[in-house]
Amino acid sequence: MAIDKTKNQHRINEAIRVKEVRLVGDNVEQGVYNIQEARRIAESQDLDLVEISPNADPPVCRVTDYQKFVYQLKKKAKEQKAKSVKIVIKEIRFGPQTDDHDYNFKLKHAKEFLQEGSKVKAYVFFRGRSILFKEQGEVLLLRFANDLEDFARVEQMPILEGKRMTIMLTPKSASKKGHTPPKTQVEASKQANESAETEEEKKRCHPTKPVL
């Protein structure tokens, strides 16, 4: 196959300028060949000679269809990218004197972040002399972790860094398609539905007789 593109990622055919190569590929007797013989073998099968390991001694070349070879490389790279997990960390800030309304508001958002598969980094920021209440900040963060125990596990316990006391939470299970409730809530809902269906079935099979 007459393809000679020197600007490609891999050198092919006439662009391979070495004396000998190690040949691999289907329907090829693997071994070391001089470059002219390797090209002749590729041409006899109407395929390309593709250099896949230029730093080997001698360089390794594959007898293959170059277009299909590139397609498979791109496909593999795309699959690997899809499998790679992108870790997202959401930050939630508290003050040492956070009231219940603000706390519950941030707790709700933390649940949403965890259900989406994101980690949550919650911290208490101490201004000036409020650092004297660092124990109060630790209690707040531990309460926060306890209220999220159905959604997350503690990756890092509260630690004081400068004016911040931080805790790191990681999701127990990620649901990127929606906000899936905890398993216990799902099971409870299922049991309630089954119970209601059973009662309805009993009523159909044993109708209540009117009182005379």
Swiss-Prot record:
Q: What is its main location?
A: cytoplasm
Among HAMAP family, the record links this protein to: IF_3
Segments of skewed composition (Polar residues): 182-195
Q: Which family does it belong to?
A: Belongs to the IF-3 family.
Residue ranges for the region (Disordered) are 171-212
GO BP terms: ribosome disassembly
What GO cellular component term, any one, is given? membrane
Q: What does this protein do?
A: IF-3 binds to the 30S ribosomal subunit and shifts the equilibrium between 70S ribosomes and their 50S and 30S subunits in favor of the free subunits, thus enhancing the availability of 30S subunits on which protein synthesis initiation begins.
One GO MF term attached to the UniProt entry: translation initiation factor activity
The family database entries (InterPro entries) matched by this protein are listed as: T_IF-3_C_sf, T_IF-3_N_sf, Translation_initiation_fac_3, Translation_initiation_fac_3_C, Translation_initiation_fac_3_N
| Claim: DNA-binding is one of the keywords in the record | no
Family annotation (PANTHER family): TRANSLATION INITIATION FACTOR IF-3, TRANSLATION INITIATION FACTOR IF-3, MITOCHONDRIAL
- Its transmembrane ranges are none
Q: Where in the cell is it found?
A: Cytoplasm
This chain belongs to which protein, by name? Translation initiation factor IF-3
Q: Which Gene3D superfamilies match?
A: Translation initiation factor 3 (IF-3), C-terminal domain, Translation initiation factor 3 (IF-3), N-terminal domain
Q: Give the taxonomic lineage as stored in the record.
A: Bacteria, Pseudomonadati, Bacteroidota, Bacteroidia, Bacteroidales
Assembly description: Monomer.
Q: Does the keyword Transport apply?
A: no
Q: Which UniProt keywords apply?
A: Cytoplasm, Initiation factor, Protein biosynthesis
